[in-house]
């Protein structure tokens, strides 16, 4: 977002000045509040219940206030970890400048309450404020204010969602991010495939390519505003290309006479790792984007493809049929010590390394079905997140808590996007204008 400075802390209203004083001391002195006064939701391997929470309509400007609070409500509901209270059950419309009537709110069963206000300064800039209240303890848990342009009101809702989500769950933010994907339209035998980008909730969709060439396997850079993808024009070899989302500049990489595919950026965004066809086999190759210097990571008779960097850049996971079937392997970033990490029934392909570094997601095909699975980088602890027909293309959210993928039921239809959390207990559809495949999740936009 342009003209969106870092959020500043927002003090509690005067009606709660004693609580505010304690909160300030807790921050300044590292004082730990009693456990029962903490608004927390711990997400783990066991069962959990979504937290009941109320998100009040933001006061001030009625149209923009409703827009921002609506974004927050939708985000928290879609996360699977919160159940927003229906406004018809609200006991009051909270006054942003006063403490809520906690006794009334406790009677509704909610544990958290979000209040806010949208106003304009003399120059016409927006000021968006919010507070998160712990209804049980009557404490303000956090509060911030943002200054921005009117056009950025919706994105401010994503930033507020992240602040609430991280405060309560202890997990990293992810709402202030985007998704790129391949938009598919037209008859199945002659699909037009365009690169599109949208907010993670499906809003603000825009086409990046025209559809004159077929687009496959886009991937965001972790460090720049670039997306790498495979592009194929009729009668030509598929080529890896990189496009900058800010300038629209586009460049082709790889050898003209060789098919290059499955590009992935290094964590610093300076290199690409890809699969390059060499005769009847395909090898993993890294390329310096600036100098175009190449280094072979694998060199053999197998089909090695779909490489993905560990977030620290020290290792690469990839897919290979060197053992007789498609499986996931891990090697050093310099190509050293390649070793298989997936075993058991069926094949495993399309690995994606979590930005937290703790998990690798992949597609496992077995018994006629396609499962999205995760395991530790050494292959232990495999678990199935979701299973069905043609679940493919896993990619992690910026906080590593959700996996985005596409599901194609077959026939004359096409794929649709879904996300599932790493516990496998939350699965949500992601709206797209048409059929969609090959999603990739951006890093957080804040500070970019």
State the predicted function of each range.
Residues 19-30:
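Bacterial N-terminal signal peptides
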Residues 43-103, 114-118:
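Short beta-strand->alpha-helix linker/helix-N-cap micro-motif
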Residues 125-127, 188-196, 236-241, 281-285, ...:
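Structural motif
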């Amino acid at each position: 977002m342009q003209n969106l400075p870092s959020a500043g802390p927002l003090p509690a209203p005067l009606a709660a000045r004693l609580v505010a004083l304690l909160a300030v001391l807790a921050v300044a002195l590292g004082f730990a509040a009693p456990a029962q006064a903490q608004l927390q939701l711990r997400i783990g391997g066991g069962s959990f219940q979504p937290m009941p929470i109320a998100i009040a309509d933001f006061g001030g400007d009625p149209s923009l206030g409703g827009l921002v609070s609506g974004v927050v409500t939708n985000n928290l509901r879609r996360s699977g970890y919160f159940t927003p209270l229906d406004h018809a059950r609200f006991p009051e419309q909270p006054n942003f400048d006063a403490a809520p009537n906690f006794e009334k709110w406790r009677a509704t069963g909610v544990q958290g309450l979000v209040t806010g206000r949208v106003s304009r300064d003399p120059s016409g800039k927006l000021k968006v404020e919010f507070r998160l209240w712990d209804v049980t303890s009557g404490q303000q848990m956090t509060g911030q204010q943002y200054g921005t342009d009117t056009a950025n009101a919706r994105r401010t809702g994503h930033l507020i969602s992240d602040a609430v989500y991280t405060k309560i769950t202890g997990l990293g933010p992810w709402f202030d991010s985007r998704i790129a994907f391949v938009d598919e339209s037209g008859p199945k035998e002659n699909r037009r495939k365009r690169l599109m980008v949208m907010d993670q909730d499906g809003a603000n969709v825009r086409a990046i390519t025209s559809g004159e060439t077929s687009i496959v396997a886009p991937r965001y850079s972790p460090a720049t505003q670039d997306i790498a993808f495979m592009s194929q024009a009729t009668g030509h070899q598929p080529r890896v290309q990189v496009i900058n989302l800010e300038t629209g500049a586009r460049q082709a990489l790889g050898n003209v006479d060789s098919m290059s595919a499955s590009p992935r950026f290094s964590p610093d965004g300076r290199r690409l790792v890809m699969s390059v066809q060499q005769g009847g086999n395909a090898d993993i190759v890294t390329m310096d984007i600036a100098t175009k210097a190449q280094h072979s990571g694998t060199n053999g008779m197998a089909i090695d493809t779909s490489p993905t960097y560990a977030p620290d850049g020290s290792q690469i996971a990839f897919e290979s049929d060197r053992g007789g079937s498609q499986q996931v392997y891990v090697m050093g970033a310099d190509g050293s010590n390649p070793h298989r990490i997936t075993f058991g029934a069926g094949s495993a392909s399309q690995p994606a390394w979590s930005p937290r570094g703790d998990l690798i997601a992949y597609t496992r095909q077995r018994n006629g079905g396609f499962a999205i699975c995760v395991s530790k980088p050494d292959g232990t602890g495999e678990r199935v997140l979701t299973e069905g027909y043609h679940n493919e293309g896993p990619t992690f959210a910026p906080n590593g808590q959700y996996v985005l993928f596409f599901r194609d039921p077959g026939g004359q239809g096409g794929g649709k996007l879904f996300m599932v959390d790493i516990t496998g207990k939350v699965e949500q559809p992601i709206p797209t204008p048409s059929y969609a495949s090959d999603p990739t999740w951006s890093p957080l936009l804040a500070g970019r």
